[in-house]
């Protein structure tokens, strides 16, 4: 079965079967996606994080189907209805929808009209009607009038109920209706009578009708949200007449009275059983598709936000702007520690601009501020203009920073633990300042869903959303790497192979023993085993370490290669890193081995060229257009300018 999995995943993703086998082997051995994509390129054939995640997801889905098949086979076996042919069909089916169609006739049911008719002994009559040969079905039905069957029509109705259920469980019939939904399904939304005023924000959908397959994700999610709130009635429907005609061509083989009874049962089956069942199926599928697209957008937006360029270790002033309540100002040192906090009131209704300037001047000089981070909320633009019109004794850069989620952070346990003696306004301003210094390190403290970079985030599948966002954060943190001696436990948690417990153990060890001096010292951390060390070491940096490789992305398992390169050139590792001319003399082919290929050697040489390089690049300043004050102000869009920098 496992080999069959490999073939199916290979066909679905267009990745060789060998790569699938090797990648799954690493995943099953406990390797993380960031580790595999960075340090096992020879094994996977150079697969990236997205491809590895896709392999993992497909494998998990196939495992779920395999477990479902086992349950289905056991259930049918217990009923004594499992034939060799049926077992073969189930074992060969890997499409979940088709699998459930096969199982449907055997699936334990609640009390249905058909089941009630069977209990009245009407199944033989239903079989007779389905043959469509007898010209007098009423006469045959009269033989069943006894007990709970009160009259001929009652008998015929029960027989039709049995036929209707048979039609609804027929694979060909279900596929026929399913194909109609796929080709021509129309999504219709109408406002619930009497809810017009309450549903004003959904007025675009009050009388909406469009092709389901062309309905984009944000419209579908909006419609489904309104439906959940009881404001819209939503339905999906194909061409009903065409569907019934197709079903009649399949099941009605005569125009005699028996055929007419079957035709009536087919119409009832479509309206009462088949159409609602397939409609539910398509409602679920379309919601899943919309969720997938929305989650993808959310993850990509989050990735861009997390990988925004950092200002670095500079002294920063963070400002949470406001009008009536004033602006909360904090001063941070180069490590992000809080030095001072103050309130200023440069805007109406208080408008103490001279006093505000004096306080800012004092703080900028006293704490040697290099840059100012202004939150992009209320009074952001006015605060930026106020600052830019002042003459300070130091040159400072002014940045607009996203404050989304800062209020949630400021009230969180993390913030209370960091600043137990300060209120939420100070904590929020600190978060704004730190986001400029290192957005990644600060934003990992906030639930990604609270950062507000996704559409309809509360309407999509929360389990899938969390999984995607957590993986995005993990990928970003490991792409950048972290300083082992300054990283918070929240940041370390996302490092490959660690998790919350080991991350906290590292912080505790650091507090008790001082700064780490080498990566090897990680092995002294409680519960740090060889596997965890292998997974995390390459993503942890130690500036000023005795071994300069400890501050690079070169994995400890490859140190011997660099040491051999240095030895061959008659220099030290430090000299090799510092001297480009020496590095140009290296012929990587000399260091190839059965376990070390050219991808790893290229990564090593690239890292030696720029050890500890930050992939996020240098920070840039974006400014508001001074000519734009309101939505009605004319603008010449010769090029797109961004109003904020998300740092």
Predicted features and spans:
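Short boundary/loop segments of OB/S1/cold-shock single-stranded nucleic-acid-binding domains
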Residues: 621-637
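A glycine-rich phosphate-binding loop feature that marks nucleotide/adenosyl-phosphate handling sites
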Residues: 180-185, 319-323, 377-382, 401-406, ...
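Long, highly charged, low-complexity intrinsically disordered interaction regions
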Residues: 67, 75, 425-426, 430-515, ...
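Short beta-alpha connecting loops at secondary-structure transitions
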Residues: 20, 57, 344-348, 371, ...
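Structured, non-catalytic alpha/beta "coupling" segments that mediate domain-domain communication
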Residues: 75, 100-102, 230-239, 254, ...
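Duplex nucleic acid-engaging cores and interfaces of nucleic-acid transaction enzymes
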Residues: 51-54, 61, 65-318, 322-422, ...
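Single conserved hydrophobic/aromatic residue that forms the stacking wall/gate
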Residues: 639-646
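Alpha-helical interaction/regulatory segments in DNA maintenance proteins
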Residues: 52-64, 523-563, 589-597
């Amino acid at each position: 079965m496992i080999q069959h999995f490999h073939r199916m995943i290979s066909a679905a993703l267009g990745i060789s079967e060998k790569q699938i086998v090797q990648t799954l082997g690493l995943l099953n051995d406990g390797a993380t996606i960031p580790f595999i994509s960075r340090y096992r390129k020879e094994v996977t054939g150079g697969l990236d994080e997205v491809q590895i995640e896709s392999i993992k997801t497909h494998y998990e889905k196939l495992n779920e189907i395999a477990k479902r098949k086992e349950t289905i086979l056991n259930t049918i076996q217990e009923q004594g209805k499992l034939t060799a042919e049926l077992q073969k069909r189930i074992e060969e089916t890997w499409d979940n929808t088709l699998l459930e169609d096969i199982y449907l006739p055997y699936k334990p049911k609640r009390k249905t009209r058909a089941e009630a008719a069977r209990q009245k002994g009407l199944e033989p009559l239903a079989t007779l009607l389905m043959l469509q040969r007898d010209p007098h079905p009423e006469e045959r039905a009269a033989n069943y009038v006894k007990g709970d069957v009160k009259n001929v029509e009652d008998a015929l109705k029960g027989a039709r109920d049995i036929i209707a259920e048979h039609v609804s469980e027929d694979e060909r019939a279900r596929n026929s209706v399913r194909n109609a939904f796929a080709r021509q399904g129309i999504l219709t939304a109408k406002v619930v009578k009497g809810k017009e005023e309450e549903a004003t924000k959904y007025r675009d959908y009050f009388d909406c009708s469009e092709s389901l397959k062309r309905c984009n994700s944000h419209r579908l999610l909006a419609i489904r949200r309104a439906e959940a709130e009881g404001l819209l009635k939503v339905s999906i429907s194909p061409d009903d007449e065409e569907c019934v005609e197709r079903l009649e061509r399949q099941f009605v083989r005569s125009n005699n009275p028996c055929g007419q009874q079957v035709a009536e049962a087919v119409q009832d089956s479509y309206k009462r059983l088949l159409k609602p069942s397939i409609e539910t199926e398509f409602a679920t599928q379309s919601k899943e598709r919309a969720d997938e697209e929305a989650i993808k957008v959310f993850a990509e937006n989050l990735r861009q936000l997390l990988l925004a360029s950092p200002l670095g270790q500079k002294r920063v002033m963070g400002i949470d702007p406001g009008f009536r309540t004033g602006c909360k100002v904090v001063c941070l040192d180069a490590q992000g520690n809080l030095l001072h906090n103050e309130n200023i009131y440069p805007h109406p209704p208080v408008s103490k601009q001279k006093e505000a300037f004096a306080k800012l001047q004092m703080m900028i000089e006293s704490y040697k501020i290099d840059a100012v981070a202004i939150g992009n909320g209320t009074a952001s633009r006015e605060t930026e203009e106020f600052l830019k019109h002042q003459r300070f004794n130091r040159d400072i850069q002014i940045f607009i920073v996203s404050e989304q989620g800062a209020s949630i952070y400021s009230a969180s346990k993390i913030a209370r633990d960091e600043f137990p003696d300060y209120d939420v306004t100070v904590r929020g301003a600190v978060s704004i300042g730190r986001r400029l210094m290192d957005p990644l390190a600060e934003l990992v403290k906030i639930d990604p869903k609270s950062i507000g970079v996704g559409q309809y985030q509360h309407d999509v599948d929360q389990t899938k959303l969390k999984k995607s966002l957590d993986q995005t954060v993990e990928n970003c943190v490991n792409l950048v790497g972290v300083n082992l001696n300054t990283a918070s436990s929240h940041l370390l948690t996302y490092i490959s192979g660690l998790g919350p417990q080991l991350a906290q153990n590292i912080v505790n060890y650091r507090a008790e023993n001082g700064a780490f001096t080498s990566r090897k010292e990680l092995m002294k951390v409680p519960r740090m085993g060889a596997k965890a060390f292998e997974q995390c070491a390459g993503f942890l940096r130690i500036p000023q370490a005795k071994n300069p490789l400890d501050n690079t992305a070169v994995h400890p398992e490859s140190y011997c290669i660099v040491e051999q390169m240095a030895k061959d050139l008659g220099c030290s590792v430090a000299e090799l890193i510092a001297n480009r001319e020496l590095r140009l003399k290296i012929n990587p082919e000399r260091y190839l081995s059965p376990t070390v290929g050219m991808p790893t050697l290229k990564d090593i040489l690239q890292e030696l060229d720029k050890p500890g390089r930050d992939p996020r690049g240098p920070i840039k300043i974006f400014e508001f257009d001074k000519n734009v004050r309101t939505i009605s102000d004319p603008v010449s869009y010769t090029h797109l300018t961004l109003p904020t920098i998300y740092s």
